[in-house]
Amino acid sequence: MKDCKPTYTPLQHNLKLTPVQPGETPIPEMTIDRKRVSYLTIIGSLMYAMLGTRLDLAFAVGLLSCFSAAPTSAHWEAAKRTLRYLQATKDMELVYDGSDVAIDMDFHGYSDADWSSDLDTSRSTSGYIFISNRAAISWASKRQSMVALSSTESEYIGLSITGQHIQWLRTFFDEIGQSQSGPTELNCNNQAAIILCKDPQFRARTKHIQWERQ
């Protein structure tokens, strides 16, 4: 796809993908650049890039991988768009700030979640990213294991998952001799979820929430 038309977003805005429907025929392989390529091969290649340096592919890879068992033409078109995005942005890189004499190894994080984005199960997707020295050091995008009844609940579950990863990161930094100088800053754009975190009392709208353990 060297000569493909460039695109600058991994997926189409508000893209909604569904599993193979009755009467549809799955397409496990397709010819790209005169080569037979399997859908699983494309997902594996995208995942390899995402786990290494391309955090911007996390959501797209998570979504596309849900249809690996029986991909249809719609899933292929979405996957090829992600490849076009990767081709257009292949010069992007992570750059860590090492200009200071004493490098600050403290990290901070961001947590976000949508609500009921899975058309088949009504489950939400949450994600997080952690920054140190002005670049990302850890990231993830994952479908939640339970159905959230509101956007606040979805964000709250996402914060729980992110909080568990903070604890793991702090332990890791301790082991390499880079203990954090204070509490880890975690940012979220849902005010109701923030209030719930600050005052986690049982309420009628939240007492049913179960914690996700990673």
State where each predicted segment sits.
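Long, low-complexity, charge-biased intrinsically disordered regions
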Residues: 1-214
